[in-house]
């Protein structure tokens, strides 16, 4: 049986739609009353593991899932050995450096050396500031990173930005983008190499559905 790791939350609905195009019905995962974390498809060909977005690449890397859907931001942050198979095109946003709108900073390089930067994505942030040759002190937060500059704990943040409304509502502004992120279909490398064709058939169906969705959108 093929196991697919699906991220609970914002990516789930579109993920289920992509797999539906491959003949895998994960619609039960969308039921708000569902409390099961492992859901087989009605046809019995596959099952879904409902996990946190950040845990998807871990389940795939360790082989507990042959396929998974996860944001590119998570892949960049965790750097686990999974195969990136398809850019699914949904869940788009950007990883950005943001500061208080009143700070006067116009770009990341304007930040003072050794200032504090708060983020859930400390690996991505470290990589970025190292590239600028700007030493900073990274403060890891698990949520509400906007409070860093608001409370004075940090000079800036590195976080995902979709519409920018949360930043604006909290008096912050994005000054530089690190990269753009979308949902990706990933696979367990060894499982892909040993595939009898069943995994590749799913991957190609998902790829075709994603291309069609991109053309329509």
Swiss-Prot record:
Name of the protein this chain belongs to: ATP phosphoribosyltransferase
Q: Which domain of life is it from?
A: Bacteria
* GO BP annotation list: L-histidine biosynthetic process
Q: Could you tell me the keywords of this UniProt record?
A: Amino-acid biosynthesis, ATP-binding, Cytoplasm, Glycosyltransferase, Histidine biosynthesis, Nucleotide-binding, Transferase
**What does it do?**
Catalyzes the condensation of ATP and 5-phosphoribose 1-diphosphate to form N'-(5'-phosphoribosyl)-ATP (PR-ATP). Has a crucial role in the pathway because the rate of histidine biosynthesis seems to be controlled primarily by regulation of HisG enzymatic activity.
Family indicated by similarity:
Belongs to the ATP phosphoribosyltransferase family. Short subfamily.
Its EC top class is transferase
Q: Which GO terms describe its molecular function?
A: ATP binding; ATP phosphoribosyltransferase activity
The keyword Ion transport appears for this protein: no
Q: Does the keyword Glycoprotein apply?
A: no
Q: What is its EC number?
A: 2.4.2.17
Quaternary structure and partners? Heteromultimer composed of HisG and HisZ subunits.
Q: Report the main location listed first in the record.
A: cytoplasm
This enzyme catalyses: 1-(5-phospho-beta-D-ribosyl)-ATP + diphosphate = 5-phospho-alpha-D-ribose 1-diphosphate + ATP
Q: Where in the cell is it found?
A: Cytoplasm
Matching HAMAP family: HisG_Short (MF_01018)
Q: Which GO cellular component terms are attached?
A: cytoplasm
Listed NCBIfam families: hisG (TIGR00070)
Q: What pathway does this protein act in? A: Amino-acid biosynthesis; L-histidine biosynthesis; L-histidine from 5-phospho-alpha-D-ribose 1-diphosphate: step 1/9
The record's comment about this protein's domains reads: Lacks the C-terminal regulatory region which is replaced by HisZ.
Do you know which Pfam families this protein is assigned to?
HisG
